[in-house]
């Protein structure tokens, strides 16, 4: 084990969010489906920060003095879009959760705050007829029919990103202040909305993307997508 990566610059994968999200329904917003780009952790779960600290103690502390280690990838290709569009899909996934799910409770509180705690203002924005914000928990969907609705869902995505990158980067640096945080390897440039990139850039030394181009040797071209 002492010879592992000795003399070679290397990185360490932590899989903080993906490991947390595979622990059961209360721990994910989008479930793991035994394929890439499927899971997204419930960053609003009260145990998420503690799990990140546990994972950092386990995986980062042993590397804090390694001169050959470049840094840590937090995760790989999380489903920042839930199962829908990049800006609204995560909020839509939360709306499908059970009324007691902590992410749905967080979304209720977030939307109530945006409406200034006014259910009348909320109903006017969303075209609903709720008598109180707790009734939101019984709904399984909210529309994305206009800019204001999409903006609200996009800002909830920003909140989720802030909770994710704050908890993970803080846990990593607590155990290893000597190496870089290399982002969460978004699935291509479309694998997360730019608001997520912005938040990642505030917490990571490097924001990383996985891109899968292919080369046509006959044409002498490299394509970034099949189209």
Set out the residue ranges of the language-model regions.
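The substrate-binding groove and active-site-proximal loops of carbohydrate-active enzymes
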Residues: 1, 31-54, 96, 111, ...
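Aromatic-lined substrate-binding rim segments of carbohydrate-active enzymes
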Residues: 1-64, 164-175, 195-197, 201-202, ...
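Aromatic- and acidic-residue-enriched segments that line the glycan-binding/catalytic groove
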Residues: 5-9, 15-37, 64-142
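A cross-domain feature marking catalytic cores of carbohydrate-active enzymes
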Residues: 12-14, 74-76, 183-186, 211
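Conserved, mostly hydrophobic/aromatic
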Residues: 59, 72, 118, 172, ...
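Long hydrophobic alpha-helices with heptad-repeat/coiled-coil character
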Residues: 60, 72-88, 210-227
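Glycoside hydrolase catalytic-domain groove-lining segments
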Residues: 151, 155-227
């Amino acid at each position: 084990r002492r010879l592992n990566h000795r003399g070679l610059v290397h990185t360490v994968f932590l899989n903080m969010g993906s490991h947390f999200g595979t622990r059961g329904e209360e721990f994910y917003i989008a479930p793991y489906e035994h394929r890439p780009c499927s899971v997204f952790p419930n960053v609003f779960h009260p145990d998420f920060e503690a799990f990140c600290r546990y994972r950092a103690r386990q995986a980062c502390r042993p590397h804090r003095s390694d001169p050959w280690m470049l840094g840590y990838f937090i995760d790989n290709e999380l489903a920042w879009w839930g199962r829908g569009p990049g800006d609204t899909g995560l909020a839509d996934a939360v709306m499908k959760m059970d009324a007691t799910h902590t992410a749905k409770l967080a979304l209720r509180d977030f939307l109530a705050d945006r409406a200034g705690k006014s259910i009348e203002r909320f109903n006017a924005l969303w075209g609903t007829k709720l008598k109180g914000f707790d009734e939101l928990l019984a709904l399984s969907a909210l529309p994305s029919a206009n800019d204001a609705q999409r903006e609200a869902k996009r800002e909830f995505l920003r909140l989720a990103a802030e909770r994710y990158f704050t908890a993970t980067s803080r846990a990593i640096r607590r155990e290893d202040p000597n190496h870089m945080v290399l982002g969460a390897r978004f699935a291509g440039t479309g694998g997360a909305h730019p608001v997520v990139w912005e938040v990642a850039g505030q917490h990571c030394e490097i924001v990383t993307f996985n891109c899968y181009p292919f080369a046509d040797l006959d044409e002498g071209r490299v394509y970034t997508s099949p189209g």
